[in-house]
Amino acid sequence: MFDSIVYFFNKSGFVTTLVLVWISLYLVMTLWVFLYKSIVLKIELRREMQSLSNILNGAQDAPEHFMFNKKRNDETKRYSNELLQAWKHQVLKQSTTGLVVLSIISSTAPFIGLFGTVVEILEAFNNLGALGQASFGVIAPIISKALIATAAGILAAIPAYSFYLILKRKVYDLSVYVQMQVDILSSKK
């Protein structure tokens, strides 16, 4: 198997090799962003669920966040709506970082793969024209080799898009818990 991979890269053009390396980097980035954000969002979600539970039970007055250290009006025992909104926006901004990488990868990887395929097919037709051979037995292996770049692009895009949707849902869940805390703290008198 390793020999066939080496043979493929030896027979491929520069652009196809570049495209496959690029798509491989995309795949590594996809896995890294997904694993990292999954862990971070799981921790944040657990923290905000606990914070909401503590606020509802009266165990704490505000979320465990540096923005709430001594920012409460002690006379009314309330936090300003502006502070609550700023906290909410900060949590959402932090939780969505990295998602744009998955979005870009899922939308561009197929086109990068297609570009590699088109260039490889153009090179193949150029070589076929120079040789004067145009039989199916000659064309089929060249086109199948060229289509590997498109397949690789699609292969990189599918997990990127799937992981994007999974993480987007986790961010939504986090935003619901944050909004519930904002609503509760805004309604306290």
Curated annotation (Swiss-Prot):
User: Under the cellular component aspect of Gene Ontology, which terms does the record hold?
Assistant: plasma membrane
Sorted alphabetically, the keyword list is: Cell inner membrane, Cell membrane, Membrane, Protein transport, Transmembrane, Transmembrane helix, Transport
Q: Which InterPro entries match?
A: Biopolymer_transpt_ExbB-like_1, ExbB/TolQ_transport, MotA_ExbB_proton_chnl
Q: Which domain of life is it from?
A: Bacteria
Instruction: Cite a single Pfam family from the UniProt record.
Output: MotA_ExbB
Keyword Membrane belongs to the record: yes
Membrane topology term reads: Multi-pass membrane protein
One biological process term from GO is: protein import
Transmembrane helix is among the record's keywords:
yes
Location(s) in or outside the cell = Cell inner membrane
Residues that span the membrane, as ranges: 14-34, 99-119, 147-167
Family in the record: Belongs to the ExbB/TolQ family.
Report what the protein is called.
Putative biopolymer transport protein ExbB-like 1
Supply the source organism's classification: Bacteria, Pseudomonadati, Campylobacterota, Epsilonproteobacteria, Campylobacterales
